[in-house]
Design a protein with these regions (language model features):
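Bacterial N-terminal signal peptides that target proteins for export
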Residues: 2-14
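A structural boundary/capping signal
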Residues: 27-243
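Bacterial N-terminal signal peptides
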Residues: 12-23
């Protein structure tokens, strides 16, 4: 685990990050969780093995059991649960330099790096009813000048921003994470904000981010194709909200 350090620009970053996430209703219009049919898990087991099937069953049971819990419990549970996934570098796991895995790939292979685990947390929270607009991905720099990705959550304008980090066991607020310096933040809907060296925000089109946003878009498309493949075992019903 890396050691972290303080950066004075983090508070400025937090302010802009809050703006970029935007304001969502404090009363979530949560989607109703509908458990997947058993045929989905059986099909996964046939294709990826019984251990993979067991992992998918277990996480869906956890999601179902905690769907109505308070938001903070969902955040802590998600962070704890997915931080147990072994950290494996992309060249070792995928034989590629920078591969963004889907949550399904991360769970079936049981490994991933910071991007993969952040994406997994995003998917788990969405399945537990957390709205898309409350979540974002922050690309940051650590004390060792390592590039790192975390998931961030902000419920409404008056609430704190929380950071879910695969290197830190606790879900901490932005002001408590003085150890991180932001580079950019983006959301699933394509909103992207670049933070410059002075801590100033510049809004840009998603195309400007180029390769990184391309990887997110590609991972989403693979995830969508994979879900569609298994929908026939789920009575034709979508496996993920807003599919």
């Amino acid at each position: 685990m890396m050691n972290f350090y303080c950066r004075t620009t983090f508070k400025t970053f937090l302010f802009f990050l809050i703006l970029s996430i935007g304001v969502v209703s404090s009363v979530f219009a949560a989607h109703t969780f509908v458990p997947w049919e058993d045929g989905v898990f059986v099909a996964i087991g046939k294709e990826h093995g019984l251990e993979a099937e067991k992992r998918i069953r277990t996480i869906m049971d956890v999601i179902q059991a905690n769907h109505e819990k308070p938001v903070m419990e969902k955040l802590k549970l998600t962070n704890d649960y997915l931080n147990n996934i072994p950290w494996i570098a992309d060249p070792d796991l995928w034989k590629r330099e920078d591969y963004w895995a889907t949550p399904f790939e991360t769970l079936t292979t049981f490994g991933g790096d910071c991007e993969d685990i952040a994406i997994g947390k995003y998917a788990m929270l969405r399945l537990m009813g957390i709205p898309d607009d409350a979540l974002g991905f922050a690309y940051v720099e650590t004390r060792d000048k390592e590039r790192h990705m975390v998931l961030v959550f902000k419920e409404n304008d008056a609430s704190p921003l929380y950071v879910l980090d695969n290197q830190v066991p606790d879900v901490l607020t932005g002001p408590e994470r003085k150890d991180l310096l932001a580079i950019y933040v983006f959301q699933n809907n394509g909103k992207l904000y670049i933070i410059d060296n002075k801590g100033e925000k510049r809004s840009v089109k998603k195309e400007f981010m180029g390769r990184k946003f391309e990887k997110w878009a590609t991972a989403k498309e693979r995830a969508r194709e994979n879900r569609k493949k298994y929908e026939k075992y789920n009575g034709g019903r979508p496996l993920f909200p807003n599919d």
